[in-house]
Amino acid sequence: ATTEIYTLSLHDALPIFLNFQTMICDLTGMEIANSSLLDEATAAAEAMTMACNLARGKKHVFLVSDDVNPQTINVVKTRAEPLNLKVIVDNPSNFRFDENVFGLLIQYPSAEGVVSVNSKMMEKAQASGSVVIVAADLLSLCLIKPPGEWGADIVIGNSQRFGVPMGFGGPHAAFIATKEKFKRCLPGRLVGVSQDVHGNPALRLAMQTREQHIRRDRATSNICTAQVLLAIMASMYAVYHGPNKLRQIAERVNYLTSVLHSSLVSGGYTVNSKSFFDTIKVAKKDKKVIEKALKKKFNFWDYGDSIGISIDETATNSDIGKLIDFFEIEWVEPVGSSTPPSLVRRSDYLTHPVFNTY
């Protein structure tokens, strides 16, 4: 009875879920996506399980970049334990792809904000047959080359930046996208386009069995939880703004981050990278900077010897001015681009009329 009622309640939302899947596929450069998962860390754990299944369970080592968000690393480690998988966290430059490795997870941009792709590591991963999983920032993909265009097999992340408040960490709708050939291993709900008895287009939940109840530990996924309301919010945010406005939002975020970067460098501070989207890591000179920020309700990532700062789509020029004041430096306009030429996005996205009509 519960299943029937739930299915009926989903009926009117299916077109919006389809929009969500289209949005994710377009931005990540992948071929197929589900209609949300619980959160980004869970999506990473699901992607690891999916990669293990693709290897037929014959390999047991999973590599994770040390510059993946720490909460994601922790959830992946926890999920790996009952599956008897070994998780190795290291710098991607040190990854060794032997016969026991079935997949790897990297962050794009990295947790420290760096926008880069380790081409040599990618070549080794692909040559070994390892499944490449990328945890991506959805808004950044309006400006930087999507993972699907540089070799990713699975892309995961969350859609919080598309109109959903931070909410002290959640809830937010996560996503997972992959290649068409891996669709049978994709966890979660998938909305497909079919035909009704009259030959009219009809939407339905595709490739779905309640196997988590039937196959138990051998199921594609044991996590049934989606984030329906949050996926609807993120989807409609994209429908409302469309590709051009989303790009403008991303450009504004990147511009404000670039102002902070150029101001810090001009003021004599050491910043971790010239390639970034919305996050930078700056060497700490004055321990009182964090104290000043906290008094004004700015929360930095304290690395000990350095500070991590992220700018989001709600930030204003006034906010950046306050950050600059904390460091006692001057506002300096940026020169040049913060994205490497090889990683600038050149492909179109959100071209469907639903994203360009309202």
Model-derived segments and spans:
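Buried hydrophobic positions in well-ordered alpha/beta secondary-structure cores of metabolic enzymes
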Residues: 24, 76-77, 104, 137, ...
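Short, small-residue-biased leader/transition segments that mark boundaries at the very start
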Residues: 1-14
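General small-molecule cofactor/ligand-binding pocket signal
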Residues: 33, 86-90, 272, 301
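Conserved C-terminal alpha-helix-loop-beta "cap" of PLP-dependent enzymes
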Residues: 244-326, 331-338
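Active-site C-terminal subdomain of aminotransferase-like
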Residues: 162-263, 267, 271-274, 345
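ATP-dependent carboxylate/acyl-activation modules
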Residues: 9, 197, 201, 214-219, ...
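Conserved PLP-enzyme active-site core in the AAT-like
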Residues: 42-200, 264-265, 341, 355
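Short loop-beta-helix segment that forms the pyridoxal 5′-phosphate
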Residues: 15, 26-45
